[in-house]
Amino acid sequence: MKLPLRAAMKVAIYDLDKTLVRKATFTPFLAFAARRLAPWRLLFLPLWIGLMIGYRAGFYDRTTLKTLGMKLMLGRQELFQLEKVGHAFATRHISKAGWIPEVSALVEDDRRQGARLVIATAAFEFYARAFARMLDIDIVIATRWDGRQIPGGNCYGEEKRRRVLEALGDARPDTSLRFVSDSFADAPLLNEAQEAIFITSSARKANRAASRGWAVIAPQG
């Protein structure tokens, strides 16, 4: 996918979880979708927690973790079903968790300036697009799902940077890039951006981000 860009255009890219949205999305999505599509699979939630512990212990990577989570909690589902439940989930998640107001204000500032708005996230595309529509953002770079596996791997860290630069294509030298994220895993893309903004309420993380030359926004509430 190539971004539709004009010469010397500003591109403003936002992470989703804990950047635009206050809380993470994947585990809440698995529970929400299982309740809608396969309620008996809610019995597997303790197993899912065990899988997350295994990931943190270094037994497998995030792509494997998310693939196992989808298969365990949802089984085989058609993409249109996942998109439908993903829309319902996004609506519910925002009603409970909410947007981060300081970041929403940045989005509107970028919009007024005529920037091309993009969400780049490790979240699955089939529900990330539902969040994007709420913000009137039509470009989403996210983790894909084909019903069995994750083509191209998790859109995370260096892979996210690669996909964004691929989308910028030949326009990259003339593009002013702002990237907003809450995660040090996004350092490859934060370091690439002319304007890097880190979202955190942690003083320790704020100091670490500032030491890398990134601006810091501390969400309130």
Regions found by a protein language model. Give the residues of each.
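C-terminal cap/substrate-recognition subdomain and adjoining C-terminal extension
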Residues: 3-5, 9, 91-221
